[in-house]
Amino acid sequence: MTFTWPSPAKLNLFLYITGRRADGYHQLQTLFQFLNYGDEITITPRQDNEIRLLTPVEGVEHDNNLIVRAARLLQSYSDKHHAGIAHKGADIHINKRLPMGGGLGGGSSNAATVLIALNYHWQTGFTDETLAALGVSLGADVPIFVKGHAAFAEGIGEILHIAEPEEKWYLVAHPGIEISTLRVFTDPELKRDTPIRPLAALLKAPYLNDCESLVRKRFRKVEQLLSWLLEYAPSRLTGTGACVFGEFESEASARKVLNQAPEWLQGFVARGVNNSPLHNFRSGIPVLLSQ
């Protein structure tokens, strides 16, 4: 049975860097929310052991793609825990709509969707907690997509607390460049000393992103894009960029601004949602009978 699964984007509604550990990892406080917009991943299970990504992503080798790595990770894990049913493969297509290096979590979301989808198709029966624990080896943001609810994250991003931010409309804009998270986090000028605060205090304060001033300084196109969007709405960087987003009270007001955007701007309008579209989709598909 073939299904097309959503692979939603995320926003960092705020992002504060509170320190750096001896091992180089950054400690942070951030608020994640999903968007009702993202990539789409179509999966057809195979009865052999082959994983085939039939729509390669430009610039990413097949075996290094997080989609393929997630599928093989689940294969390997199920091999150890479900002898006799793990020898299944998949043909995978992706309709890639999210920009790479945009701060929208596209690669992590793809990995999480594959873990959840193949857990369903292969009937491996793992819990979301198990899948999230597997996913963290693929990327720090994978667990938030697996668990499927807006969350406040602490530590290096691994400590998650369910959150219920307001579900606003957003205009998300991309400047047409890719920004490496590693490049931003290793920059000596990155702000790393924001005081740790309780969530209640953070929710009452203006939402900010500690990476924003540095990224605006290093990338002229981000500076240009954010300056334009700030003329219309409260706006900021998501993650380490390159995407920025503006907050709107309605879809119509967001689309009105998008319709008058300069030609060089790439953007879309989406609503922030606290329940992941991936989990909403999963709850609506039929339960497979054991084979």
Swiss-Prot record:
List UniProt keywords, sorted A-Z. ATP-binding, Isoprene biosynthesis, Kinase, Nucleotide-binding, Transferase
> For ATP, which residues are the binding ones?
P99, M100, G101, G102, G103, L104, G105, G106, G107, S108, S109
Annotated GO biological processes are:
isopentenyl diphosphate biosynthetic process, methylerythritol 4-phosphate pathway; terpenoid biosynthetic process
Q: What are the positions of the active site?
A: K10, D141
InterPro entries per record: GHMP_kinase_C_dom, GHMP_kinase_C_sf, GHMP_kinase_N_dom, IspE, Ribosomal_Su5_D2-typ_SF, Ribsml_uS5_D2-typ_fold_subgr
A Pfam family matched by this chain, by name?
Answer: GHMP_kinases_C
Q: Which Gene3D superfamilies match?
A: 3.30.230.10, GHMP kinase, C-terminal domain
What's the Enzyme Commission number for this chain?
2.7.1.148
Query: Any keyword Phosphoprotein?
Result: no
Top-level taxon of the source organism: Bacteria
Pathway where it operates:
Isoprenoid biosynthesis; isopentenyl diphosphate biosynthesis via DXP pathway; isopentenyl diphosphate from 1-deoxy-D-xylulose 5-phosphate: step 3/6
Catalytic reactions on record = 4-CDP-2-C-methyl-D-erythritol + ATP = 4-CDP-2-C-methyl-D-erythritol 2-phosphate + ADP + H(+)
NCBIfam families with a match to the protein in the record: ispE (TIGR00154)
Subunit description: Homodimer.
Which HAMAP family does UniProt cross-reference here?
IspE
Name of this protein:
4-diphosphocytidyl-2-C-methyl-D-erythritol kinase
At the highest ranks, the source species' classification is: Bacteria, Pseudomonadati, Pseudomonadota, Gammaproteobacteria, Enterobacterales
